[in-house]
Amino acid sequence: MILKGENFKMVNKKSNMYQCWINHKGIKKSFYKEYLNNILVLNKSEIITSAVNELKNTFYQIEDVKAIQNIYEDEREIKGDKFIKLYIRENDKLINEGYEIKYLKTEDNKECISICAKNDNGVLYGVFALLRLLEQNYEFKDKEIIDNPKKNIRIVNHWDNIDGTVERGFAGSSILFESCRNKDIMKAVMDAIGGIAATNEALRKAFNDDYKVADDLERINDYARMLSSVGINGVIINNTNVHRSETYLMDDKIDIVKIISEIMGRWGVKTYLSINFAAPITLGDLQTADPLDNEVRTWWKKRAEHVYSIVPNLGGFMVKADSEGRPGPFTYGRNHADGANMLANAIAPYGGILIWRCFVYNCRQDWRDHTIDRAKAAYECFEPLDGHFLDNVYLQIKNGPMDFQVREPIAPLFGTMDKTNKLMELQITQEYTGQQKHVCFLVPWWKEVLSAQTYANATASQVSERINGIAAIVNVGSDENWTGHFLAQANLYGYGRLSWNSDLTSEQIIEEWINLTFGDDPIIIKNVQAILMNSWETYEKYTSPLGIGWMVAPGHHYGPDVDGYEFSPWGTYHRADCNGIGIGRTLESGTGYAGQYNEPLKSLYNNLETCPDELLLFFHHVSYNHVLKSGKTVIQHIYDTHFEGCEAVKEFISKWEELEGKVDKDIYVQTLERLRIQFDSARDWRDQINTYFYRMSGIEDEKGRKIY
């Protein structure tokens, strides 16, 4: 059988789909575009060269083919009366990778827009910021812009496998790796099965293939440029579930890492490697991976020396241990600090950091046992270890206690562990939010999480204040538009901007993205903004209600299956019966999970009367006739929201159809197709959820609508 899909089309790298938000076409309308004629560059580096090339390519894209851009190293040689100046120097107003953009006049009355930074990364970010502002026709005269990143670590995680498949990938195959002989077959596998859990070793053995860096190195360079344009400074290139084949990325496949690292480095993006905790065994050198065993510790030190001798700019390692079948320190009776510190010690001499995921829980739970609670696992595992981790260890904590459900409370770990470095983990790829078949703009959700109060202490209570950086599983693949659904590009753009400055509003971010992507047509801005800003709430309305989560088809996680996980070992239950629904997580009669929060959150969630409606079923098992703060019963809320959500998708389609002829034809057609797929799926969700709970409760819809 021959499988065909979007991956097999030739990618047009000049298309609007491919160019994303960095096509720079809007600069043609800027009053300041003539400054691009002359560029003064006072420092040299590979990253500065990328910054200059960005200005150069922009100039030749927007100007007449006969125009010439001049690059200078000496200000005295500048012939024009307007220029852009790039330079590095100490500046008390700047920190880390921040930049200053300033309008000034020289002694000989020339006009200049200067970009100053403390390092070359800052200059590059300043150039992208300048171009972004030019596209929005910003008035620079007598202005000074100081922009420092809120966090030093701003990374994306790839769940790419070395054979070219992508776990939870919904935009085609990997842009980083591919099979040597069966590339098209592996792309077909991605088309056929999408982002189901990682490719298993049996499939790889059946193909008997070898693996390499993707042939299209130009696309990897374009991707690095895309990341840099929104301030992302790190990329973990391979799946956190490291299998046997990927283990060799730190052995005889290390040249793959070197090639990717060199390309990423041109754009100020550090490369990180997910590693196999059991690598000493997998690579056949030792019989144990015990982190306190001297031979194991020596093995890792030598391995780190080898890796950094070939990839000197590697940012560090990422580890998923003791979770979902992955090996870890628990195997040897050790704790996670033992495991993390052993690896952190090995890479410390090279400036490497060790990112250790906190996604640790018992995935072999007995559904009959109501005392076991997956939500409690990360806190119970890591909180007692506060202060035990080395300074170059960073714990990567999911935004919520479960697994990127459309509504969860913040993870309790953000309100504790003051002596430990913490990263927040978000998910850009839409595993549980429509898999890039549905439009679901995630920035408003992330804003809620980052601004949430933990009540940990008076000086740093907000989640954004209590983390050292942000990470996110990225949504990129080999599709021409990068993200499967064109509008899903807004999530990658939004993540980058939010990781740089979490004070930006969702409205600011989406207005920027629309302007950079589509231009300044007011109808486009109005309609696309209306679709995106309402999409997360809409998705929540027609899927799982009131924070209960899940109810998705097992395995691939797309579409409704109310009882799909109800009797599974994964700890993902809704506990619905003929009387009510919800998980009891109170201190008095539930699992006690609510007790992991600081006051007043502990009491807020623990008390049925004060628990927010949107999280009610996450914390409490209630009857279908329980009255919400809205005045509706739980069952009527379920009926109403599912009808409302489905109707909202109809409105999305109508608003998009108004843009025919105004947006790029290919973008219009592909997006309309996805919106229609979304409506069909939303209707399935509506009818299956409403029918399930009508049959379970026997309570009719007050409005008499059709329920099956």
Question: PLM ranges: what are they?
Answer:
Residues 5-8, 16-26, 30-31, 36, ...:
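Feature activates predominantly on carbohydrate-active enzymes
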Residues 40-46, 86-91, 116-118, 160, ...:
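Structural motif
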Residues 49-73:
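N-terminal segment of the mature soluble domain
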Residues 50, 54, 122, 218, ...:
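Generic recognition of stable, solvent-exposed alpha-helical segments in well-folded globular domains
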Residues 66-97, 113-114:
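Short, well-ordered secondary-structure micro-motifs within conserved domains or adaptor modules
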Residues 69-74, 356-362, 526:
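Acidic carboxylate-rich catalytic motifs and surrounding loops in phosphoryl-/glycosyl-chemistry enzymes
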Residues 210, 285-511, 517:
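Catalytic-core regions of glycoside hydrolase
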Residues 458-708:
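Catalytic domains of carbohydrate-active enzymes that cleave complex glycans
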